[in-house]
């Protein structure tokens, strides 16, 4: 995986609190175990008026022409609550979302997002309010997220955020659990060479 350093992208504002993983990706779409193909089902019950996903809901914000191609999702508190399904960040990533900004995220969802190379940015409620106002008032509004200096820039204003150093290291260097393990491949091979043959 390539690392995440900085991203500037169009923002889609999802002005709802406590969005759970069943809303992000409904259970009927969880049959697959790879990460590809879930984007078309993202927020299915909100994006579409029919079960087949052929009739877009014109009232849902992500279907608005002005937000097509958005790569930054702006949300309210407790985003990603509910079950621990990793399909939720898979769906967001497959749709094209690279950054999520909210006052808070569910803990498991937060970790799963980072494992899938998406950056969940926690700002204060008042800061999120300011960005909502900026995005909704300005078609084509973009924000820049700089992970190296941990700053969000929106409407010529900067907002600082925090992320623990280990997770930041993983994001900057594009490391998932497998990548972290492979960093120690030499030591693993050295250890395996010392194991008695009857234990192999």
Curated annotation (Swiss-Prot):
<comment type="function">
    <text>Catalyzes the isomerization between 2-isopropylmalate and 3-isopropylmalate, via the formation of 2-isopropylmaleate.</text>
</comment>
<dbReference type="InterPro" id="IPR050075">
    <property type="entry name" value="LeuD"/>
</dbReference>
<comment type="pathway">
    <text>Amino-acid biosynthesis; L-leucine biosynthesis; L-leucine from 3-methyl-2-oxobutanoate: step 2/4.</text>
</comment>
<comment type="subunit">
    <text>Heterodimer of LeuC and LeuD.</text>
</comment>
<keyword id="KW-0456">Lyase</keyword>
<dbReference type="InterPro" id="IPR004431">
    <property type="entry name" value="3-IsopropMal_deHydase_ssu"/>
</dbReference>
<dbReference type="GO" id="GO:0003861">
    <property type="term" value="F:3-isopropylmalate dehydratase activity"/>
</dbReference>
<dbReference type="InterPro" id="IPR000573">
    <property type="entry name" value="AconitaseA/IPMdHydase_ssu_swvl"/>
</dbReference>
<dbReference type="Pfam" id="PF00694">
    <property type="entry name" value="Aconitase_C"/>
</dbReference>
<keyword id="KW-0100">Branched-chain amino acid biosynthesis</keyword>
<keyword id="KW-0028">Amino-acid biosynthesis</keyword>
<dbReference type="GO" id="GO:0009316">
    <property type="term" value="C:3-isopropylmalate dehydratase complex"/>
</dbReference>
<keyword id="KW-0432">Leucine biosynthesis</keyword>
<dbReference type="GO" id="GO:0009098">
    <property type="term" value="P:L-leucine biosynthetic process"/>
</dbReference>
<dbReference type="InterPro" id="IPR015928">
    <property type="entry name" value="Aconitase/3IPM_dehydase_swvl"/>
</dbReference>
<protein>
    <recommendedName>
        <fullName>3-isopropylmalate dehydratase small subunit</fullName>
        <ecNumber>4.2.1.33</ecNumber>
    </recommendedName>
</protein>
<comment type="similarity">
    <text>Belongs to the LeuD family. LeuD type 1 subfamily.</text>
</comment>
<dbReference type="InterPro" id="IPR033940">
    <property type="entry name" value="IPMI_Swivel"/>
</dbReference>
């Amino acid at each position: 995986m390539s690392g995440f350093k900085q991203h500037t992208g169009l923002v889609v504002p999802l002005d709802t609190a406590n969005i759970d993983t069943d809303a992000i990706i409904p259970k009927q779409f969880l049959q697959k175990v790879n990460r590809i193909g879930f984007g078309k089902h993202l927020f299915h019950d909100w994006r579409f008026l029919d079960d087949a996903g052929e009739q877009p809901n014109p009232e849902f914000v992500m279907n608005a022409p002005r937000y097509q191609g958005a790569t930054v999702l702006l949300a309210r508190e407790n985003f990603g609550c509910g079950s621990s399904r990793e399909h939720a960040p898979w769906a967001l990533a497959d749709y094209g979302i690279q950054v999520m900004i909210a006052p808070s995220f569910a803990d498991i969802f937060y970790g799963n997002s980072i494992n899938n190379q998406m950056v969940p940015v926690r700002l204060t409620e008042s800061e999120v309010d300011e960005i909502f106002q900026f995005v909704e008032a300005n078609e084509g509004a973009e924000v820049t997220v700089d992970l190296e200096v941990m700053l969000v820039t929106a409407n010529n204003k900067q907002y600082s955020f925090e992320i623990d150093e280990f997770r930041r290291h993983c994001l900057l260097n594009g490391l998932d659990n497998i990548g972290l393990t492979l960093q120690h491949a030499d030591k693993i091979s050295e250890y395996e060479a010392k194991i008695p043959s009857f234990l192999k």
